[in-house]
């Protein structure tokens, strides 16, 4: 029995010693396992093609004072005042057309007025950049004080199908200015501008008339823009005629103070920009500013303004005049203005 007890005691002692050695062994292996796991994770991340994909570039942040929520109306809740003098507002007035009608000249003339703050470049928000959102659009605008008017001009709006609906969604009270010009001379001026950038352009005849000999090709944008009545018809589905002012591109050259005076009246502004601000540059055939905004010297518009037009045979000019005549007459009826284009 004693032997059995001894044997039992020896076995128990051996098991206790073995358990102690196993625990010690496991304890000694733990740091090694931890090191192996860390090294394994590092190797996985360091192997080519195994790193996490690079984070996408963040979307352009809005201007510091802009809210992150979407905006649907000027002055809507959640649009805090911008820091600094004044605040950025949605435009109360837009020069929406037309290309090569005199929009740049009108904008520069209006910028002489102390109560007009205008964006210098064309933002193309309502035709090309609408997906960026109204908060982004407002962040582009200059700061204005109470009583000042924010403006921008993008002449392609007038011929953009979606523009009237989008502008109405921003504000149904927006005032719309359209500078129009004889559609024949406008088309030739449009062609001259394109030709200056694309020397290998086909002839005016080849573009304006199908196969150079057939009927007028309204698929060519230079021709299609001049169908003012058709474009206006679409705009009138969203805005009443009282929201429009139609400025004569021809009178903007011959009597800039008179046309700018009409615009100031339309915007509810005092007539500050007058004859004293203009002089006629015989070389360019254009009115120039005696004192440009922010300057003390006279200034004419850019070199591209008043560029010579290519010679177009009179027979082609007459065909275009005949083509546009019914559209012009309808435009006169719609606007209540006779622009004298025939």
Curated annotation (Swiss-Prot):
Bridged cysteine pairs (disulfide): 288-300
The keyword Transferase belongs to this UniProt entry's keyword annotation: yes
Region described as Disordered: 1-21, 55-85
A GO term, aspect molecular function: [heparan sulfate]-glucosamine 3-sulfotransferase activity
Glycosylation sites: 281
EC category name: transferase
Topology of this chain in the membrane: Single-pass type II membrane protein
Protein's name in the database: Heparan sulfate glucosamine 3-O-sulfotransferase 6
Protein's organism: Homo sapiens (Human)
